[in-house]
Amino acid sequence: MISAAEQFRLISHGVADLLPEDEFKKKLEKAVATNTPLIVKLGLDPTAPDIHLGHTVVLRKLKLFQDFGHKVIILIGDFTARIGDPTGKSVTRPPLTEEQVITNAKTYQEQIFKVLDPEKTEVRFNSEWLSKLDFADVLKLASKYTVARMLERDDFHKRYTEGRPISIHEFMYPLMQGYDSIALKADVEFGGTDQTFNLLMGRHLQGEEGMPEQTIITMPILEGLDGVQKMSKSLGNYIGISEAPSEMYGKAMSIPDELMMRYFMLVTDMSIEEQEQLSKDLESGAAHPRDVKMKLAHTIVRLYHGEEAANFGQDEFVRVFQKHAMPTDIPEYKVAITEEPVFVPQLLSDAGLTASNGEARRSIKAGAFKIDGEKCNEEHIVLKDGMVLQVGKRKFIKIVSC
């Protein structure tokens, strides 16, 4: 293992909170002195299995722990997903079925290994121990915390003061997540800043059991492509880690300039020293923001698709956005071609170029719809084989007769 001081320097870079910091330093020092790896836990609730860059913020930090020789456990909350994490929710969430949980968990595992080393990752499911608790065990667990303390949590407090219902089983979620830390004997637990209450619950319950208490590391919430709200698939401001290289590159080029260095810090493998130098170059004018953003986009694509794909994504971006040419690889959309006009909003929606007919109409009205590179404001057109339809700057399909 490298020195505890160097591990701390690299691990603490870019984190939101490290609680308590002195304890974490001592854990690292002991791990190095005894050559005993720390047990580092990340719990995942498999309710939305498609991972985007926002999720990789914590995964990249976990990869650092793996590189230092520590033991990383990804805990799939298959049992707790049947309750649904109430964190940040204004209403009670419906539970998932067992089949949904299994399907989502499988997808999670496939995607997290795009960041983590599968040979150094232990995947566990909390049904291993939670399903074995009897009612007496549950009551004992419930006795470890008070309703008053539960209501200190922001989302519970807000719902309570507004008179909105909170189900008893929702109080059990943080307790069960905390119990996971007892079962795994976690030394460190990771999460987002919105999970601090639940993470501290694990520390509290470990102390109640007379165990060494875990330290907490929370990572910042990554802003999405709009630069304002957190990255979210539902908000459409995300970069999915399984997206095509050209799509991923194009999206990365839309990141606001002021967030470029934050993205380098949170979602890439660029060293701290390189980040500091690049930041200085931007401030001094030695580096142009466009070139830095292209470097960021190339780095992101390389991490998930490799160097060759990153080069392709960059070439496509230059071709389409700087030279205003058509992409070389346009997805085909098969449709029956007749002499009858088709309703364009429905076609665009069905083809996935827009999310709805309404969005399609707005795109047409705004001049964002093109046919073979030419703007079109018609809502009814006659299709032709090989015709290329475009919405916005990045969405294309080629019409193919079926």
Task: Describe the role of every protein-language-model region.
Residues 63, 73-112:
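Active-site rim/loop-helix segments in enzyme catalytic domains that contact anionic ligands
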Residues 58-62, 175, 198-206, 300, ...:
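Buried hydrophobic packing segments
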Residues 205-402:
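Conserved nucleotide- and phosphate/pyrophosphate-binding catalytic cores
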Residues 15, 95-218, 225:
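Divalent-metal (Mg2+/Mn2+/Ca2+)-assisted nucleotide/phosphate chemistry catalytic cores
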Residues 35-44, 72, 173-183, 224, ...:
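Short, hydrophobic/aliphatic alpha-helical segments
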Residues 24-86, 190-196, 202:
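N-terminal catalytic cores of NTP/NDP-binding nucleotidyl/phosphoryl-transfer enzymes
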Residues 84-88, 133-139, 227-231:
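Short acidic, glycine/serine/threonine-rich loops at helix termini
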Residues 1-39:
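Positively charged, low-complexity intrinsically disordered leader regions
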